[in-house]
A protein has these predicted regions:
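Bacterial N-terminal signal peptides
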Residues: 4-17
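Histidine-/acidic-rich catalytic cores in large beta-rich domains
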Residues: 23-310
């Protein structure tokens, strides 16, 4: 069986010291799964190649979000600023958080050239910032908590012009209009998911091409796909595995082949930090190198952007 993927590499035979592995459920190596990826984590922010080697280091760990752009530059959000860096570390875009708010949580380059950013704090808001660093769109957010760190994380702009934001302590993913009106609410404290006791805090929310929404639920240690009515149509969690690969999953990405890549932030030691799972819940790729990641973006062999939705 041969897959054409755009993500992390896991080839135990290629580089055991870097803990890269690509196997099927029977332990047989799957030929063709070779990925490099951008990663934002507490000890490293940069690019790792398909053999598990670090090929580019941003120079600053602890990033919250990031993307490899079409031209090879890297857009990164830290808690206090967003930068676009060339591979030579030249800063070509910079936004510093406002003095009134406590931290930043999102960065994404939009089709119109603006950069999507979320600010968390006394004035939680979603921003579009132009190439010169000027705020051109401001959308007030309703996270239902004053805890800045837990207000929202990876927000994204939708094809219809609205915005999708996960609100952790509200146990909700909300779709906002450009004026800040809440249009749709997806609840993550559903009884079938364990209710609030399961701490299904939504961290990543991605609108898929089929209209469903992919959500990583951090402390709940699960990933779910919700239909437009908010009903669970797919779920994968530690209940499906013996080795508990979910450890505070934060970032996620749906690949073009339909598989999902999940980042386990709290994984340490030899535990799985990143893994790729099929619709049938078979894990076909794993990375067990550095400490856990907040997010990762799967890329082609040259660390260029993947067409998969992150």
């Amino acid at each position: 069986m041969r897959f054409k993927l755009f993500a992390l590499a896991f080839t135990l035979t290629a580089l055991c010291s870097e803990r890269v592995l690509s196997q099927d459920s029977a332990g047989k190596e799957i030929e063709g799964i070779q990925h490099s990826f951008f990663v934002a984590g507490p000890s490293f922010t940069g690019i790792i190649d398909e053999e598990g080697k670090e090929t580019w280091n941003s120079g600053r760990a602890g990033a919250r979000d990031g993307f490899v752009l079409e031209d090879g530059n890297v857009l990164i959000a830290w808690g206090d600023e967003v930068k676009e860096l060339t591979r030579e570390h030249e800063v070509v875009f910079h936004y510093k958080k406002s003095a009134e708010n406590g931290e930043l949580g999102t960065c994404a380059r939009l089709a119109n050239g603006n950069t999507l950013i979320t600010e968390l704090g006394v004035k939680p808001r979603l921003l579009e910032v132009d190439a010169e660093g000027a705020i051109v769109v401001e959308v007030p957010l309703k996270p239902e908590t004053d805890n800045a760190h837990m207000q929202t994380r990876m927000a994204r702009k939708l094809a219809n012009g609205n915005y999708l934001a996960p609100h952790l302590l509200a146990f909700k993913v909300k779709e906002y209009s450009p004026t800040g009106e809440v249009l749709t609410v997806f609840k993550t404290d559903l009884e079938e998911l364990g209710g609030r006791e399961a701490e299904n805090w939504p961290f990543t929310a991605i609108r898929l091409s089929n209209g469903n929404t992919l959500v990583n639920l951090t402390h709940g240690n699960k990933t779910v796909e919700l239909n437009p009515k908010g009903e669970v149509v797919w779920k994968v969690s530690n209940e499906d595995y013996e080795d508990d690969p979910f450890a505070d999953p934060c970032g996620a990405q749906r690949l073009p082949n339909g598989n999902t890549v999940i980042a386990s932030y709290a994984a340490g030691g030899d535990r799985v930090k990143l893994f790729e799972v099929t619709r049938a819940k078979e894990i076909v790729w794993r990375y067990m190198g550095r400490t856990g990641f907040i997010t990762s973006k799967c890329s082609r062999r040259t660390a260029s952007p993947s067409p998969g939705t992150p």
